[in-house]
Every structure is written in C-alpha cells, then in structure tokens.
C-alpha cells in the first residue's frame, strides 16, 4: 500500500472520507483479532492503519471546525 499524504486526503469528498474511516476502523479491529489469535503476519500494518486513520480524522475535524466557524 502506498503512503497516503494529507494533501490527497483533503481532496476526498465527505462520503469517501467517512467510508475510508469506517474501513480503517474495521481493519484495525480485524488486525487486533488476528494478533490475539496469533494469525497476524504483517504487524507493521497496525502502525500504517493507525496513522492513516489519525490523518483522516484530523482532516475531518478541520473541515467540521471550519464549517462551524464560517
């Protein structure tokens, strides 16, 4: 998976962003489950998913704050 930049994330529509957030949360849940059952091979995916989720939530919060202040 290529690294997603915040510039790319800012170009997403609100619906695309919410879909990505939902998918990443599901992926993190699945990763935690696989790790608990010792089936996880790519442990680095935890950090990547958490980072991308944080970036998406940051951009989402920026949008909501700019909409309320305007």
Curated annotation (Swiss-Prot):
GO biological process: translation
Family: Belongs to the universal ribosomal protein uL29 family.
PANTHER family: 60S RIBOSOMAL PROTEIN L35/50S RIBOSOMAL PROTEIN L29, LARGE RIBOSOMAL SUBUNIT PROTEIN UL29C
Gene3D superfamilies reported in the protein's UniProt record: 1.10.287.310
Organism from which the protein derives: Prochlorococcus marinus (strain NATL2A)
Disulfide bonds listed in the record: none
GO cellular component terms, A-Z: cytosolic large ribosomal subunit
NCBIfam families cross-referenced by the UniProt entry: L29 (TIGR00012)
Protein's UniProt name: Large ribosomal subunit protein uL29
Gene responsible for this protein: rpmC
Pfam families: Ribosomal_L29 (PF00831)
Top-level taxon of origin: Bacteria
Single GO MF annotation: structural constituent of ribosome
Keywords assigned: Ribonucleoprotein, Ribosomal protein
Organism taxonomic ancestry: Bacteria, Bacillati, Cyanobacteriota, Cyanophyceae, Synechococcales
């Amino acid at each position: 998976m290529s690294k997603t930049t915040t510039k790319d994330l800012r170009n997403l529509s609100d619906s695309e962003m919410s879909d990505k957030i939902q998918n990443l949360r599901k992926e993190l849940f699945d990763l935690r489950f696989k790790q608990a059952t010792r089936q996880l091979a790519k442990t680095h995916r935890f950090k990547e998913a958490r980072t991308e989720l944080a970036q998406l939530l940051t951009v989402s919060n920026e949008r909501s704050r700019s909409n309320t202040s305007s």
